[in-house]
């Protein structure tokens, strides 16, 4: 083996890192770079005075060598026995692998290394690295350690600009209109050259020109004690004699951690059980250790029921480790004063879930899952570790009438810390008075609960002001802070303009563009609950993403300062999916990456035409915290809508396009592009100089200077809250989808809203009114689901979703209302006659409201589907009807939700039922009236109508042939005759009928002709007389016949004789 002298700057950089407790970064370019890892590890081992540093080796799939130590030893023994191998022929890399504590990890399993500390990190397979992985792995390296990045052999480092990363496959979709541009890789490479603690070398340890900033590295003297360490030592000396606190603070590593522990002890000693202490910090600041020491202090103060919550008990290893360190400091003995209970669940890997203390009295430290918040009835102290990783509604449920400690990671790579700091802590701050460490106890909150906020800034794994940490925060914008508002005041929204951001310039690593990027990312981070470093890669490289910013009037005299960003918008182009892919999605369930809104709505509505439309999804919109609720967000949306509708045009657009075509032709002739990226010289890896691009275009473009894409709609997907829904609905967006399951982090349901664009240049693929049909179908499904998944919604949010403002598609709503009228068949199907009687009785306050509760679902659906049009129902009455009828809530639920008394709720509900009952009665009367047959009016054509032309209509006013009085008399006479006829036919009454008609009675009753006695004959007597007469006639005829027969017989006898 040929020995080669290593550049002294490499050894000096490693030794300086050990002396200052800072980390060092090395980039090795070449396929043999792994062979230099043992040399760097050897230099590090000689520089530190402790055991050999452990190594974390991360890779994608193939490690490139065997990591199996037993196989290596067998092969070595076999080669030695055959006499082939010798000590001189032993490979240094194999010796390094076999003698060093190395942990190998796939990039996909890098989450398992959280909480561990290593002395050296090796990263290979650069194409698989993402910003999340970069931050997650680098944070595990301790102070004085090394970070080694291995790159493959390349002729120029600028090949990284065009390298295809694995994550780029997620950015491409079927309808991508552009190619992926590796802007992040370029910015990453340029940042390495600027870092003073980084060296870029080839696989022979020759330092490349990109590290020209580190031409001369001077050796630094080891600092025995930093100012922070001196302050901590003096502080420990001061509290040494303090009971409990003195012993526990000895375990702290930084001054921030000691101050945080002291704040915890102050809250514990008060024993008010109405305080909340929040601890926020970046990763590696000692949050879990401070909580563990605080729990041991609570045990010393006599707290009996202590509960600890975390996403999983495995995350509490560090916390319980420092609980036991605190016990050791207070001279607690295991098995004598306390005992441990480990979990038998194999998923928890023997994690500690309970600690029983029985030194003075029985005390317990119990792990509890966030879902079991109902079991906290007897709690005195609840500790929530990594609260940002727990869904926000569960964290709220964990709060109660007891002392609460919670910690959360912010500005970290998990991307969940902002959810807690933005929402929960903000609510606690608003509901209570923040009590500082030096404040008086009399400064209590109105609600009887105090809030203390603690923040840890000083790292523990390495010393403060670590160059690698500063480089990583700048590269990934992890520590982006919001600039304070301008002292000149805020401009009126009408005076602001929306600008298009050129991403090539934004990520060019120029000083001005870097400052603008930090401002923009800080704006996004402060306004959204979930942020991760991968979002930065999406902003920079995704071909379908675009950025816009809203700026106030630009001062031309200000040539130094950057304009203040009032609002930032990130959008993504979606849609225009091929018909084959759509059919595969509908029939086979196939779904490509990207295109969130088209694929989601295709699955929900099974529509083949909508995914073929082109649209834009608003990924993020963030307003400056100092300028929120001033109209800037609405103004940005308004200008963005006008831009995509083609309302913002440029008169010189045609000329500009012709000029650009001419410039492209000239550039092609010259053989160079407009933006100079790669020089045409034959510079090698050892001689090339990497600098930012020159001749870059402007950072900001006016909307009139860029031609918009042809779009059919604009959409947004967000976590549903009442405030956000009102914001989007005010901008004329209609909801079309609401996810049934809530988000794991925020507990909010994802909502998709769309707005149709009126662009005359677009070819309409869907039928007219497609958005309104989606919205009506969504409302119908939402109404049916309010009693199930959406039952816990606040009635005001549900009412906002169902309430249509007049500005939203008034024509479509008006045309659809005629079809939504209640029909007679529907009414008979939904309500029986008994139902209507009960509703009538309740409206008249005769029965209780429980009698009509079963009618509420049907009545509510009719009202909210516009089949019962009642104009004078107020919003509060509609909310009560929705909550009781559709969400199946009780009156007790509405008392707290609407802040009304029970009698007020029932009174408003009764008024609503009265109005509904009146409307139903009117509907019923109308149905009866419509069911009656219509009489056709027939009038003869008399002389007075000779001038009339055409057929006589039913509505013509023609006089009848007979007046009403004569018609009534005829009718009465017919009725009397019918009654008489019925009486005459009745056998039981007919014998009592009096003889005589009207004329006979009038003659008999004449004055002066009335005799002293009157005999009245019955009709029955008359009938008897007539019967007798008829019988006599019959008997006479019979006798005559008999006589005639006798005479004939006599004559016959005589003739015979």
Swiss-Prot record:
UniProt-annotated location(s): Nucleus, Nucleolus
Binding site residues for acetyl-CoA: 621-623, 628-634, 730
InterPro entries on file: Acyl_CoA_acyltransferase, GNAT_dom, NAT10, NAT10/TcmA_helicase, P-loop_NTPase, TmcA/NAT10/Kre33, TmcA_N, tRNA_bind_dom
Biological process per Gene Ontology, one example term: tRNA acetylation
Main location: nucleus
Keywords: Acyltransferase, ATP-binding, Nucleotide-binding, Nucleus, rRNA processing, Transferase, tRNA processing
Low complexity biased stretches: 1038-1057
GO MF assignments: 18S rRNA cytidine N-acetyltransferase activity; ATP binding; tRNA binding; tRNA N4-acetyltransferase activity
Domain N-acetyltransferase: 549-682
Binding site for ATP: 284-293, 461
EC number assigned by the record: 2.3.1.-
Bias kind Basic and acidic residues: ranges: 1018-1033
GO cellular component: nucleolus; small-subunit processome
Residue stretches of biased makeup (Acidic residues): 654-665
Catalytic activity field: a cytidine in 18S rRNA + acetyl-CoA + ATP + H2O = an N(4)-acetylcytidine in 18S rRNA + ADP + phosphate + CoA + H(+); a cytidine in tRNA + acetyl-CoA + ATP + H2O = an N(4)-acetylcytidine in tRNA + ADP + phosphate + CoA + H(+)
Region named Disordered: 654-675, 1001-1057
Family (UniProt): Belongs to the RNA cytidine acetyltransferase family. NAT10 subfamily.
Quaternary structure annotation from Swiss-Prot or TrEMBL: Part of the small subunit (SSU) processome, composed of more than 70 proteins and the RNA chaperone small nucleolar RNA (snoRNA) U3.
Function: RNA cytidine acetyltransferase with specificity toward both 18S rRNA and tRNAs. Catalyzes the formation of N(4)-acetylcytidine (ac4C) in 18S rRNA. Required for early nucleolar cleavages of precursor rRNA at sites A0, A1 and A2 during 18S rRNA synthesis. Catalyzes the formation of ac4C in serine and leucine tRNAs. Requires a tRNA-binding adapter protein for full tRNA acetyltransferase activity but not for 18S rRNA acetylation. Part of the small subunit (SSU) processome, first precursor of the small eukaryotic ribosomal subunit.
Name this polypeptide is given: RNA cytidine acetyltransferase
Source organism per UniProt: Dictyostelium discoideum
Encoding gene (name): nat10
